[in-house]
Amino acid sequence: MLRIITQQADVKAELQRICDRTHDEQVLHKEATVREVLQAVKRQGDKAVLHYTDEFDNQILKAEELRVTGSELDAAYQQVSQELLEAIQLASRQIEAFHRQRVPKSWVHFGDDDIVLGKRYTPIDRAGLYVPGGRAAYVSTVLMNAIPARVAGVPRIVIATPPGAQKAINPAVLVAAQEVGVQEIYRVGGAQAIAALAYGTETIPKVDVITGPGNIYVTLAKKLVYGNVGIDSLAGPSEVLIIADEGANPVHVATDMLAQAEHDPMAAAILFTTDPALAKNVQVAVERQLVDHPRRIDTEKAIAHYGLIVLVESLDAAAELSNEFAPEHLELEVKDPWAVLPNIRHAGAIFLGYSTPEAVGDYLAGPNHTLPTSGAARYASALSVETFLKHSSIIQYSQTALNKVAGAIDALATAEGLPSHADSVKRRIQQDE
């Protein structure tokens, strides 16, 4: 059952327990398996990818079957409803419109003495997007990862996603990929997919950045290949924190909590409220909705282990506790969310008001739903166009400008014991003279 505790209880310790749920010994023990997979793929390429696809996904593939064919891509459109296709297209338009507003611009500044300083943004060459399989067809994951990469101008975007029964990829995933311009899709999942994207194989290209969520094996693999390639983040199980007052609808709050819990048995769903009646009503509503929930077993586990209702003294107190937890998703289900918002410092995405459930942001509002988890919102942000861009500094000095700073550079280089640094300036000054 969903627990109710008061702020006077050891709330911070309980929140820390939930935040640390991916750091237990059982999870860390899996790192050895992931290291083995990474090394095998690095050494053996396609052979290892095929071996682990058989072992972990129970699908026997040949190397030539790794890439989804053009005929499979075409056939996918016949297997999705017109309603779903139109929803994908609507979401694509809105996500693209938002991300196009966030493209950073290169710039240069022309200063005194013909000094030119600036910053130049360029896209990476190749992006690898991981799309989970298994529990659902993660159409939104395709959109939220591929669209920012495309807007950034990445010339080659590839998707890796695990094969299902009979080697099939969910047609909705294939349609979503094509709608956002991705035709290169590989049927490979898990740590072996991350290894293939990081190191390259005979069939799967090595990429520059890997993005997209996955299970603990995928997350550990991304952690271990970081440095060889860039990654978006180390995504843990999903989480929502709801701050609600007496005006919130308990059935709506309960549904929002279950919407998070249904993701994964380790997902977290937390409510902070000033109203004891709301707390009790939400507790009852959660139990009622669980009775015939299609994902009852996993959802019930998440609620039992990582679900929590905390009675707080004030909305200010709720905001401060929220900042310590730094949730992936934060819902402000209060009468005046704009009054609470200034007190929020750490959250991946913030949903304002009674009519803005997290699902709006998950699917089509526009902002990215790939967000920092497990407290990482204290220092990290959502996936964005900049995930797929690099920036280079632009510097040009005239001889006049160099002459003016030569003494300072000489002093700094000498202090650091780097004589050739100093000489690289002094010889240009001598040459000018």
From Swiss-Prot:
Binding site for Zn(2+): 260, 263, 362, 421
Keywords per UniProt: Amino-acid biosynthesis, Histidine biosynthesis, Metal-binding, NAD, Oxidoreductase, Zinc
Reactions listed under catalytic activity: L-histidinol + 2 NAD(+) + H2O = L-histidine + 2 NADH + 3 H(+)
Family annotation (InterPro entries): Ald_DH/histidinol_DH, Histidinol_DH_CS, Histidinol_DH_monofunct, Hstdl_DH
EC number: 1.1.1.23
PROSITE patterns: HISOL_DEHYDROGENASE (PS00611)
UniProt cofactor note: Binds 1 zinc ion per subunit.
GO biological process: L-histidine biosynthetic process
Binding-site residues for substrate, renumbered to this chain: 238, 260, 263, 329, 362, 416, 421
Required cofactor(s): Zn(2+)
Residues reported to bind NAD(+): 130, 192, 215
Single GO MF annotation: NAD binding
Disulfide bonds: none
Pathway(s) of this molecule: Amino-acid biosynthesis; L-histidine biosynthesis; L-histidine from 5-phospho-alpha-D-ribose 1-diphosphate: step 9/9
Listed GO CC annotations: cytosol
Enzyme class: oxidoreductase
Cleaved signal peptide residues: none
Catalytic residues, chain numbering: 328-329
Entries under SUPFAM superfamilies matching the protein: ALDH-like (SSF53720)
Biological role: Catalyzes the sequential NAD-dependent oxidations of L-histidinol to L-histidinaldehyde and then to L-histidine.
Record-stated family: Belongs to the histidinol dehydrogenase family.
Protein name: Histidinol dehydrogenase 2
Upper classification of the organism: Bacteria, Bacillati, Cyanobacteriota, Cyanophyceae, Nostocales
